[in-house]
Each structure stands twice: as structure tokens, then as C-alpha cells.
Amino acid sequence: MYSGNKVVISWIVSIGFVGMPEFMSSKTFALCRQRSFLHGPAGIRSDEEKENNFFGRVSFMDAALLLEYGWVLLVLIGLEGILAADNALVMAVMVKHLPEEKRKKALFYGLAGAFVLRFGSLFAISFLVNVWQVQAIGAIYLLYISASHLLKRYVFKKEDTHKETKQSGFWPTVLKVELADIAFAVDSILAAVALAVTLPGTSLPKIGGLDGGQFLVILAGGIIGLVIMRFAASMFVKLLKERPSLETAAFVIVGWVGVKLALYTLAHRDIAVVSEHFIHSGTWKLIFWGVLAAIAVCGWFMSGGKKQPEGAQNEQKNSTRERA
């Protein structure tokens, strides 16, 4: 009964189309009549339904893509913020021996260099990722900075003050800061690329060997990281004055970042000493960030407050006795 009614309705609709050719083109009229004859009235609406379903799927895919990109961007902002804070801490340590005016200038040059180098490295992503020598130089320099400071402080205690006076010039300090910026820029861009390449591709043109959407995520994360560095550098200079022993923890962190860069270098496909799978695994990320957090926490609690000179302590004791 239902199929008979369907055929009747189909014929009625098809007959009705005979009186409607002036409102549509002959091609559209023929198509509608054919579909009404074969599939009934539902066939007329099938194109519209398919179109709605298609746009529904597209909008869902767009929303999912935006959510995925947004989540990775948030993670990248946090990561770049931590690396920028490390970079700012190293700059603060390197310039703290300078007079106030020169210290501000050295910090300005260091921040300007960090801006230029990180933006430059964005457009040389393919070069930085494929050439392991660049990664190796950055790793060696960070390890050298860390080892040099720790050896001077805890092994060659007598030579430490003499060498510091020799290396307290303004421009040598700026040069050291810029070299550290290069190493941190390489580490930052490698970390950003490792996150961004996990994102699905977009229709945007490629930039620097990367998909346009992935590149924009790295760019946004890098800019926010630089803004964090701008404000963190001055804060760390003040913090190091209050907690001088925190400087040792800062150099241990520098060495640990150097170890990370060294492992990235050894995992390069041209060397392949370390498994590339291990470098990108959750186990290594957990180890790296866990050790980094442990160094920071231990350094904070072990540094304590700034010790007062003996003269100041005696004056404070005398004043308390007089009050008593």
C-alpha cells in the first residue's frame, strides 16, 4: 500500500512539474522530473539534504581543527614561556656584575638580540632542523657555560674572583649574552617544531618548509615567549640580588637544557646514536621536565635569603640591645 501511494505521489509531482517549466531551466526541470519519477518526492530534497550534511561535516571538521590548533598553541605558550624564563635567567646572571646603567644596556642588547635571533630562526626552520651541526654548537656552548661556572665556583675557588674581574667588561658580557641567545633560540625553535609538526596540515602556503598553519602557531608562541622574557629578565635580576645562591641552580638548568640539545643532536638521522623515538616519547619529556622542576625547586629552597655582612649584623644586634 505504501509503495503504491509513493508511486502515485511521484507521478502527481512529476505531472505538476509540467506546468512549471517557465520558472526553471530545461536542465533543472528535466533533472527534477527524473528524480521525482525514480525516487519520489524524497529525491527532490536529496541534494539539499546532502548539501546540509556536507556543510555540517565541514563545520565540525573546522571546529575540531581549531580546537586542536588552539590546544597546541596553549601548550606551546607555556613551553616557550619556560624557555624564555630560562633565557632571561641566564641573561640576568651574566649581567649582574655590571654597574646599574651598563646592566640595563646589556639587558636591552640581550633582549634585542633574542628578538632578532628567534624571528630569524623561524624563517630558517628547515635549516635548523636538518643541519645537526647547528644543534651541536648550541648544546656544546650551553654545557660549556654551565660547567665553567660550576668548576670556577666549587673547584677553582681561588681563581674565581681574579677571572671575574678580568671578564667584567661591558662588550664581552654582551657577546656572551648574544651567544647564549643563539643557543636558546635553537632550543626554542626545535621544541616548537616538535610540537607543531604533530598538527594536521592546512590549505595555507608553506613557509620555511612548514605548513602555513603550523608556522603561524610557532610564530604566535614565539612572540608570547619573547614578551614573557622581556618582563622576566628584570625580575630575575632583582631575585638574584635577594637570593644570590640561586645563580648556581640557574647554571645547572642551563646545563640540563644543553643535555637536551645534545640528545637531539645525537638523535639526528645522520648520526642516529640515540633513538629518535625516545627523544619524542612521553618518557623523555617526563624525565626532562621533572628534572628541570626539581632543579628549580631545590635551588629555591637551598638559596635562602641574602646574607647580611658581619658589620650590618653587629649593628643590628647592638640596636636590639640598646632597645632592650
UniProtKB/Swiss-Prot annotation:
Protein name (Swiss-Prot/TrEMBL): Uncharacterized membrane protein YkoY
Keywords: Cell membrane, Membrane, Transmembrane, Transmembrane helix
InterPro entries membership: CHP03716_TM_YkoY, Integral_membrane_TerC, MFS_trans_sf
Family, as annotated: Belongs to the TerC family.
NCBIfam families: R_switched_YkoY
Cysteines engaged in disulfide bonds, as pairs: none
Segments passing through the bilayer: 4-24, 63-83, 106-128, 132-151, 179-199, 209-229, 246-266, 282-302
Coiled-coil intervals: none
Presence of keyword Membrane: yes
